[in-house]
Amino acid sequence: RNDNSAFAKNFCEKNRIDYLQLDKEALTNLFLNLDTATLIISVSNRYLFPSSILSKSNIRVINYHGALLPKYPGRNAEAWAIFNNDKVAGITWHYVVEVVDAGAIITQKSLALTSKVTSFSLLRAYSKMAFEAFVEIIDQVLLQTVDVIHQNFNERQAIKYSWQKPNDGQLDFNWSSEEISAFLRAMDYGPLQVLGLPYFYFEDEKYEFSKYKIVEELTTLDNGTLALLNNELVIERNNFKFILSELKVAE
C-alpha cells in the first residue's frame, strides 16, 4: 500500500482486475509463504523488501526507479533532476537487493529535459517510458537471460528521503532566473503536491503559494525587482517574469 493506493484500487475496479490491499506485515507474510517460483514487480511503493524475502531462492524482485541510477537513489528523483538543472534524465529497471536502489541494472531509458518540464509532467513521461521498457525486458527477466549492468558505487549519490525538498522548499530571491525556474518546476507535482507547498520570505513574513507562472519576456525593470500586489508576488529578472499567486501567510 502507498500514496497511490486509492488510484490503483479505482483502476483495478474499473478494469475488473483482482487485487489485494495489505499492510506491511500482511504483505511480508504473504511473500514469506510463497513456495513456488515468483517474480515480484515493484512499482512506486514505499515497501522495503527485507532480507528474509530477498534471500528466498524461489523469489526474484525487480523495481522501477525514476532516475538513471546510480544517480538519485531514493524518493522523488524527478524533482532533484529538475532542480539540479540536469540536461538528461530517465528511468531504470533493476533487481532489488537489501541496499535501496543498488541492485544490478536491467535496462534504462532516457530523455532530454527542457526548460518547461515539471515534476508532474516528468512523472507522466516516466510512466510511459517505464511501461515500454518493461515490455522490452520482461521475457528476458522471466527466462533469466538479462545481461545486467552492475552499478558503480563510486558514482552513487546519497539517498534522497521523502521529507527532503529542494532547498527545503524555500524560494531564494538571490537565485538566478534559471535557478528560480528550476526550483518552481521541481516543486510542481500538480494535484499530487508530493513535496507540499513552496514558500518564500518577504518583509519578514513567510508566505506559501500554490500557483506560479513563468513568462519569458524583455523587461524594462532592474534585475531582481520584487513587487507584492493583489495577493501576487512578481519577480522580474534576466528577461524572465515569475508570478507567484494564491499566497497565504504561513504559520
Give residue ranges: language-model regions:
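Short, structured protein-protein interaction patches enriched in aromatics and acidic/basic residues
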Residues: L197-K211
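One-carbon transfer enzymes
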Residues: R1-V194, L233-L244, V249
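Low-complexity, glycine/alanine/valine/leucine- and proline-rich hydrophobic stretches
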Residues: K213-F242, V249
